[in-house]
Amino acid sequence: MVGKQLLHLSARTTFKARFIAQPEPFWGNFGIFEDSLPNGYGLYLLNRLLKKQGVNDMDLTPIQRLSIIGCSGMGALCYIPETYIGEEKSLPDLDDLQQMALDVLSEKSNKDEDILYFNSGNSGGCRPKCLFHDTEGSWLVKFRHTYDPKDMGLMEYRYNEINLFCSQD
Protein backbone atom coordinates (compact mmCIF):
# COMPACT_ATOMS: atom_id res chain seq x y z
CA MET A 1 0.00 0.00 0.00
CA VAL A 2 2.83 2.41 0.82
CA GLY A 3 4.44 1.83 -2.59
CA LYS A 4 1.21 2.73 -4.36
CA GLN A 5 0.81 5.88 -2.29
CA LEU A 6 4.37 6.96 -3.10
CA LEU A 7 3.87 6.22 -6.78
CA HIS A 8 0.60 8.13 -6.83
CA LEU A 9 2.22 11.08 -5.05
CA SER A 10 5.20 11.15 -7.40
CA ALA A 11 2.94 10.98 -10.45
CA ARG A 12 1.18 14.19 -9.33
CA THR A 13 4.32 16.03 -8.23
CA THR A 14 6.29 18.16 -10.66
CA PHE A 15 9.70 19.52 -9.87
CA LYS A 16 10.38 23.08 -10.90
CA ALA A 17 13.98 23.33 -9.76
CA ARG A 18 16.55 23.18 -12.55
CA PHE A 19 20.28 23.31 -12.37
CA ILE A 20 22.18 24.84 -15.25
CA ALA A 21 25.95 24.55 -15.27
CA GLN A 22 27.70 27.86 -15.70
CA PRO A 23 30.58 28.38 -18.15
CA GLU A 24 32.98 28.79 -15.24
CA PRO A 25 34.70 26.98 -13.62
CA PHE A 26 33.98 23.75 -15.56
CA TRP A 27 33.22 24.90 -19.11
CA GLY A 28 29.46 24.32 -18.85
CA ASN A 29 29.75 21.08 -16.91
CA PHE A 30 29.22 20.19 -13.26
CA GLY A 31 32.24 19.33 -11.11
CA ILE A 32 31.06 15.79 -10.40
CA PHE A 33 31.10 15.03 -14.13
CA GLU A 34 34.06 17.23 -15.06
CA ASP A 35 36.17 15.12 -12.71
CA SER A 36 35.57 12.12 -15.01
CA LEU A 37 37.11 13.88 -18.00
CA PRO A 38 40.78 13.69 -18.92
CA ASN A 39 42.99 16.70 -18.45
CA GLY A 40 46.65 17.33 -19.03
CA TYR A 41 48.18 14.27 -20.67
CA GLY A 42 44.88 12.46 -21.33
CA LEU A 43 43.32 15.55 -22.90
CA TYR A 44 46.40 16.05 -25.06
CA LEU A 45 46.08 12.50 -26.42
CA LEU A 46 42.32 12.81 -26.90
CA ASN A 47 42.70 16.08 -28.81
CA ARG A 48 45.25 14.47 -31.12
CA LEU A 49 42.96 11.48 -31.76
CA LEU A 50 39.97 13.72 -32.45
CA LYS A 51 42.03 15.93 -34.77
CA LYS A 52 42.98 12.84 -36.82
CA GLN A 53 39.24 12.24 -37.28
CA GLY A 54 38.59 15.85 -38.26
CA VAL A 55 36.87 16.75 -34.97
CA ASN A 56 37.63 20.00 -33.16
CA ASP A 57 37.64 19.32 -29.41
CA MET A 58 36.24 22.80 -28.75
CA ASP A 59 33.05 21.93 -30.67
CA LEU A 60 32.13 19.06 -28.32
CA THR A 61 29.43 19.48 -25.69
CA PRO A 62 29.94 18.19 -22.12
CA ILE A 63 27.60 15.26 -22.93
CA GLN A 64 29.65 14.33 -26.00
CA ARG A 65 32.86 14.46 -23.97
CA LEU A 66 31.38 12.19 -21.29
CA SER A 67 30.19 9.70 -23.93
CA ILE A 68 33.80 9.40 -25.10
CA ILE A 69 34.78 8.43 -21.53
CA GLY A 70 31.97 5.87 -21.48
CA CYS A 71 32.86 3.14 -18.98
CA SER A 72 36.63 3.45 -19.33
CA GLY A 73 37.25 6.21 -16.79
CA MET A 74 39.05 5.79 -13.48
CA GLY A 75 36.03 6.62 -11.32
CA ALA A 76 32.81 4.84 -10.48
CA LEU A 77 30.67 6.67 -13.04
CA CYS A 78 29.83 5.20 -16.43
CA TYR A 79 28.41 7.21 -19.34
CA ILE A 80 26.16 5.44 -21.84
CA PRO A 81 25.90 5.46 -24.80
CA GLU A 82 29.64 5.30 -25.37
CA THR A 83 31.43 6.94 -28.27
CA TYR A 84 34.59 5.04 -29.21
CA ILE A 85 37.68 6.97 -30.27
CA GLY A 86 40.68 5.10 -31.64
CA GLU A 87 41.14 1.36 -31.58
CA GLU A 88 41.48 -0.99 -28.65
CA LYS A 89 45.07 -2.19 -28.58
CA SER A 90 46.88 -4.32 -26.07
CA LEU A 91 49.40 -2.88 -23.68
CA PRO A 92 52.94 -3.17 -25.08
CA ASP A 93 56.06 -3.62 -22.98
CA LEU A 94 56.29 -0.81 -20.41
CA ASP A 95 59.66 0.39 -21.73
CA ASP A 96 58.16 0.61 -25.22
CA LEU A 97 55.17 2.48 -23.84
CA GLN A 98 57.49 5.00 -22.15
CA GLN A 99 59.29 5.61 -25.44
CA MET A 100 55.98 5.95 -27.31
CA ALA A 101 54.83 8.56 -24.78
CA LEU A 102 58.07 10.53 -25.12
CA ASP A 103 57.85 10.40 -28.93
CA VAL A 104 54.21 11.57 -28.98
CA LEU A 105 54.78 14.32 -26.39
CA SER A 106 57.82 15.64 -28.25
CA GLU A 107 55.78 15.37 -31.49
CA LYS A 108 58.29 13.01 -33.11
CA SER A 109 55.47 10.54 -33.76
CA ASN A 110 51.74 10.68 -34.36
CA LYS A 111 51.02 6.97 -34.70
CA ASP A 112 50.74 5.77 -31.11
CA GLU A 113 48.16 8.13 -29.57
CA ASP A 114 45.46 5.47 -29.66
CA ILE A 115 47.60 2.91 -27.79
CA LEU A 116 48.57 5.51 -25.21
CA TYR A 117 45.03 6.88 -24.81
CA PHE A 118 43.31 3.51 -24.63
CA ASN A 119 45.68 2.27 -21.94
CA SER A 120 45.73 5.52 -19.92
CA GLY A 121 42.33 5.17 -18.25
CA ASN A 122 41.52 8.67 -19.57
CA SER A 123 44.08 10.03 -17.19
CA GLY A 124 44.37 13.40 -15.65
CA GLY A 125 47.58 15.09 -14.66
CA CYS A 126 50.45 16.09 -16.87
CA ARG A 127 52.58 12.94 -16.82
CA PRO A 128 52.06 9.94 -19.09
CA LYS A 129 50.61 6.90 -17.38
CA CYS A 130 48.92 3.60 -18.06
CA LEU A 131 46.78 1.06 -16.27
CA PHE A 132 48.56 -2.24 -15.81
CA HIS A 133 46.98 -5.47 -14.56
CA ASP A 134 48.78 -8.58 -13.39
CA THR A 135 48.15 -11.46 -10.99
CA GLU A 136 48.90 -9.23 -7.99
CA GLY A 137 46.37 -6.55 -8.90
CA SER A 138 45.87 -3.37 -10.87
CA TRP A 139 48.48 -0.65 -11.03
CA LEU A 140 48.68 2.91 -12.24
CA VAL A 141 52.13 3.18 -13.84
CA LYS A 142 53.50 6.70 -14.24
CA PHE A 143 56.11 7.54 -16.86
CA ARG A 144 58.36 10.52 -17.11
CA HIS A 145 57.48 13.52 -19.24
CA THR A 146 59.82 15.01 -21.83
CA TYR A 147 60.92 17.68 -19.34
CA ASP A 148 61.52 15.25 -16.44
CA PRO A 149 65.01 14.00 -15.59
CA LYS A 150 65.70 10.43 -16.67
CA ASP A 151 65.80 9.25 -13.06
CA MET A 152 62.40 10.76 -12.19
CA GLY A 153 60.95 7.38 -11.24
CA LEU A 154 63.78 6.74 -8.80
CA MET A 155 63.32 10.21 -7.31
CA GLU A 156 59.59 9.61 -6.76
CA TYR A 157 60.38 6.22 -5.22
CA ARG A 158 62.79 7.83 -2.76
CA TYR A 159 60.24 10.49 -1.83
CA ASN A 160 57.76 7.69 -1.19
CA GLU A 161 60.26 5.89 1.06
CA ILE A 162 60.78 9.11 3.04
CA ASN A 163 57.02 9.55 3.33
CA LEU A 164 56.60 6.00 4.61
CA PHE A 165 59.42 6.48 7.12
CA CYS A 166 57.92 9.74 8.41
CA SER A 167 54.45 8.19 8.68
CA GLN A 168 55.57 5.51 11.13
CA ASP A 169 54.24 5.74 14.70
What are these regions (language model features)?
Residues M1-D169:
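Phosphate/dinucleotide-binding and metal-coordinating scaffold of catalytic cores
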